[in-house]
Amino acid sequence: MPCRPLQGLVLVGLWVCATSLVVRGPTVSLVSNSFVDAGALGPDGVVEEDLLILGELRFVGDQVPHTTYYDGGVELWHYPMGHKCPRVVHVVTVTACPRRPAVAFALCRATDSTHSPAYPTLELNLAQQPLLRVQRATRDYAGVYVLRVWVGDAPNASLFVLGMAIAAEGTLAYNGSAYGSCDPKLLPSSAPRLAPASVYQPAPNQASTPSTTTSTPSTTIPAPSTTIPAPQASTTPFPTGDPKPQPPGVNHEPPSNATRATRDSRYALTVTQIIQIAIPASIIALVFLGSCICFIHRCQRRYRRSRRPIYSPQMPTGISCAVNEAAMARLGAELKSHPSTPPKSRRRSSRTPMPSLTAIAEESEPAGAAGLPTPPVDPTTPTPTPPLLV
């Protein structure tokens, strides 16, 4: 794989810092606003600030897996300075990841990672930011890093080029040599899918700790120190398959907790996922809280309302009615003097029956007229008989 100078990567990285860039691969895409970081060596020979590369692996468009759960693997290669072949720095194997049209390799059931002891302060994190971090980097960490991503049973891997530039004595340390002497099968562009045992192993006299298999690189990284062993060159072919099983008579060491995926890695959430969960949850909580407040307010108004008495008119204690006794007496005399009239027909009269005029006159007289003296009546004068209405 031809290697370009890191000066070009630095210029491209400075331009990309202003906006996000999506690099699309065959099976997955890398979203980042910077693919390179640079630092300067301090008096003690290390970079005081951490070198960071932010980014996320995402499925874009038709890259979303068709199966409900998928497996995958991620390999990190390093092109060191000088005439040295690339090395495998980190290998991650994920199992049973749920299909999601967003961040790749999230909420996987198991995550196994193997890290090279020659790079103790380098971290590769797929679930959290930053994607690549180097703490107290020395000049040995400078160079080009290649991220190879395998998804499912895809025959081709997605390659993403990253860069770390370190300035020493006023110049940028970069790799400008060709790799024509390296085996083509040991290059990221042509190497097959590697096993976790393919990580770079330094010489026995240079290694401070043996190679370990961890779920997250940060759990086994020792404390940074001013003296960091330099990565050594290696031309040993990488094994492309699983290691051969030992005979039944050989005692196998029990696997430690570091060789298996921890529970934290299974349920690790990114910032975007947390925001996507927090927004609907907060809306539901606000609606529920508002409903409770309205219910309590209505209940308080109901109990505070003063109960007004129902209107009931008062019945009079006594009924007073003025009765014209004289009119009643004359009406009784008329009924006795006249014979009973035949029963009226059932046919309804069209005329409204009128009462006796004398009765009306008597009833219309004021109450004070009854007490006045009446003039004498001549017995010879016939008394007029009032007409009867039929």
Swiss-Prot record:
<keyword id="KW-1043">Host membrane</keyword>
<feature type="region of interest" description="Disordered">
    <location>
        <begin position="200"/>
        <end position="261"/>
    </location>
</feature>
<dbReference type="GO" id="GO:0043657">
    <property type="term" value="C:host cell"/>
</dbReference>
<keyword id="KW-0732">Signal</keyword>
<feature type="glycosylation site" description="N-linked (GlcNAc...) asparagine; by host">
    <location>
        <position position="175"/>
    </location>
</feature>
<dbReference type="GO" id="GO:0055036">
    <property type="term" value="C:virion membrane"/>
</dbReference>
<feature type="transmembrane region" description="Helical">
    <location>
        <begin position="277"/>
        <end position="297"/>
    </location>
</feature>
<comment type="similarity">
    <text>Belongs to the alphaherpesvirinae glycoprotein I family.</text>
</comment>
<keyword id="KW-1032">Host cell membrane</keyword>
<comment type="function">
    <text>The heterodimer gE/gI serves as a receptor for the Fc part of human IgG. Dissociation of gE/gI from IgG occurs at acidic pH. May thus be involved in anti-HSV antibodies bipolar bridging, followed by intracellular endocytosis and degradation, thereby interfering with host Ig-mediated immune responses.</text>
</comment>
<keyword id="KW-0472">Membrane</keyword>
<feature type="topological domain" description="Virion surface">
    <location>
        <begin position="21"/>
        <end position="276"/>
    </location>
</feature>
<keyword id="KW-0945">Host-virus interaction</keyword>
<feature type="signal peptide">
    <location>
        <begin position="1"/>
        <end position="20"/>
    </location>
</feature>
<feature type="glycosylation site" description="N-linked (GlcNAc...) asparagine; by host">
    <location>
        <position position="257"/>
    </location>
</feature>
<keyword id="KW-0812">Transmembrane</keyword>
<keyword id="KW-1031">Host cell junction</keyword>
<keyword id="KW-0325">Glycoprotein</keyword>
<keyword id="KW-0261">Viral envelope protein</keyword>
<dbReference type="Pfam" id="PF01688">
    <property type="entry name" value="Herpes_gI"/>
</dbReference>
<feature type="compositionally biased region" description="Low complexity">
    <location>
        <begin position="202"/>
        <end position="237"/>
    </location>
</feature>
<feature type="topological domain" description="Intravirion">
    <location>
        <begin position="298"/>
        <end position="390"/>
    </location>
</feature>
<keyword id="KW-0946">Virion</keyword>
<keyword id="KW-1040">Host Golgi apparatus</keyword>
<comment type="function">
    <text>In epithelial cells, the heterodimer gE/gI is required for the cell-to-cell spread of the virus, by sorting nascent virions to cell junctions. Once the virus reaches the cell junctions, virus particles can spread to adjacent cells extremely rapidly through interactions with cellular receptors that accumulate at these junctions. Implicated in basolateral spread in polarized cells. In neuronal cells, gE/gI is essential for the anterograde spread of the infection throughout the host nervous system.</text>
</comment>
<feature type="glycosylation site" description="N-linked (GlcNAc...) asparagine; by host">
    <location>
        <position position="156"/>
    </location>
</feature>
<feature type="region of interest" description="Disordered">
    <location>
        <begin position="334"/>
        <end position="390"/>
    </location>
</feature>
<comment type="subunit">
    <text>Interacts with gE; this interaction enhances the Fc receptor function of gE.</text>
</comment>
<protein>
    <recommendedName>
        <fullName>Envelope glycoprotein I</fullName>
    </recommendedName>
</protein>
<dbReference type="GO" id="GO:0044156">
    <property type="term" value="C:host cell junction"/>
</dbReference>
<keyword id="KW-0899">Viral immunoevasion</keyword>
<keyword id="KW-1133">Transmembrane helix</keyword>
<dbReference type="GO" id="GO:0016020">
    <property type="term" value="C:membrane"/>
</dbReference>
<dbReference type="GO" id="GO:0044177">
    <property type="term" value="C:host cell Golgi apparatus"/>
</dbReference>
<feature type="compositionally biased region" description="Pro residues">
    <location>
        <begin position="373"/>
        <end position="390"/>
    </location>
</feature>
<dbReference type="InterPro" id="IPR002874">
    <property type="entry name" value="Herpes_gI"/>
</dbReference>
<dbReference type="GO" id="GO:0019031">
    <property type="term" value="C:viral envelope"/>
</dbReference>
